[in-house]
Amino acid sequence: MNRPERLQPGVKLRDADKVSRIPVKIVPSERETMLRKPDWLRVKLPASNQRILEIKQALRSNGLHSVCEEASCPNLAECFNHGTATFMILGAICTRRCPFCDVAHGRPLKPDAEEPVKLAQTIRDMKLKYVVITSVDRDDLRDGGAQHFADCIREIRKLNPEIKIEILVPDFRGRIDAALDILSTEPPDVFNHNLETAPMHYRKARPGANYQWSLDLLKRFKERHPNVPTKSGLMMGLGETNEEIAQVLRDLREHKVEMLTLGQYLQPSKFHLPVERYVSPAEFDELKVLADELGFTHAACGPLVRSSYHADLQAQGKEVK
């Protein structure tokens, strides 16, 4: 029996190569079977792309990554023009193979020890007031990357003392308490971890993750830092029902999560999970009403909402759709 070829560090696997070994196999979508994208998902492009080019240049010159680009976010133009970006630390190669996500899989390189300082300097140069810091999954690291998050928060605050920092973290599988011990040295202003979908769809959409682990991570952070808001995000269109999503919202509130983002899943390529339905704006509005009734302090629900979409406005309590 031939052994699978060992991945070389730094090599990005995408599309069919990325999802070749997940438990629920992906059958590449044929154009004629793909659902037609409705009009409410049309993204209006800005009149000028100057600000977009400036932000991309700032990222390139410092060897930094944005999840906006790596995950092919549909809101990239709007957010970059708004002067916001979600920085992705610890490289652009993930140790997981989630088939909804467009971030590459592979064996990551060692963390860049200079990245926290580069990130802080870039944020200062961009004159940002609110930043979101996220990362790929780093199951290869003993702490899951928690120390690197803490280092980034510390360096950012050194150069940007008035800034607000939201972190969007992986699940720190098998090392939650150790990771939270480290993050307690430099707690963020908002702690975000995405559940992504309802638990019965985890095997298909989040191989290697566990619904209860993710809930426990959010709850345990809140127990340690009761004054720091906790936040989570979900996608719709992966085969879930509205009632399944409603139950996830109840579970989040039972685990003391206060902020919510709920948006439409969009298929990055034919090798990713197909969109099983497009959820109407009216349905998102109904789930927004439920979220408010359940006691979420902030709930952004709409087709183009993403976890860090206008995160600065949401943190200020402003309406985001």
UniProtKB/Swiss-Prot annotation:
Its EC number is 2.8.1.8. Its cofactor is [4Fe-4S] cluster. Binds 2 [4Fe-4S] clusters per subunit. One cluster is coordinated with 3 cysteines and an exchangeable S-adenosyl-L-methionine. It catalyses: [[Fe-S] cluster scaffold protein carrying a second [4Fe-4S](2+) cluster] + N(6)-octanoyl-L-lysyl-[protein] + 2 oxidized [2Fe-2S]-[ferredoxin] + 2 S-adenosyl-L-methionine + 4 H(+) = [[Fe-S] cluster scaffold protein] + N(6)-[(R)-dihydrolipoyl]-L-lysyl-[protein] + 4 Fe(3+) + 2 hydrogen sulfide + 2 5'-deoxyadenosine + 2 L-methionine + 2 reduced [2Fe-2S]-[ferredoxin]. Pfam families: Radical_SAM. [4Fe-4S] cluster 1 binds at residues 68, 73, 79, 308. SUPFAM superfamilies: Radical SAM enzymes. Residues 80-297 form the Radical SAM core domain. One of its GO terms (molecular function) is lipoate synthase activity. The keyword Kinase does not apply. One of its GO terms (cellular component) is cytoplasm. The keyword Repeat does not apply. Keywords: 4Fe-4S, Cytoplasm, Iron, Iron-sulfur, Metal-binding, S-adenosyl-L-methionine, Transferase. It is found in: Cytoplasm. Pathway: Protein modification; protein lipoylation via endogenous pathway; protein N(6)-(lipoyl)lysine from octanoyl-[acyl-carrier-protein]: step 2/2. [4Fe-4S] cluster 2 binds at residues 94, 98, 101. InterPro entries: Aldolase_TIM, Elp3/MiaA/NifB-like_rSAM, Lipoyl_synth, rSAM. PANTHER family: LIPOYL SYNTHASE, LIPOYL SYNTHASE, MITOCHONDRIAL. Belongs to the radical SAM superfamily. Lipoyl synthase family. This is Lipoyl synthase. It comes from Shewanella sp. (strain ANA-3). The lineage of its organism: Bacteria, Pseudomonadati, Pseudomonadota, Gammaproteobacteria, Alteromonadales.
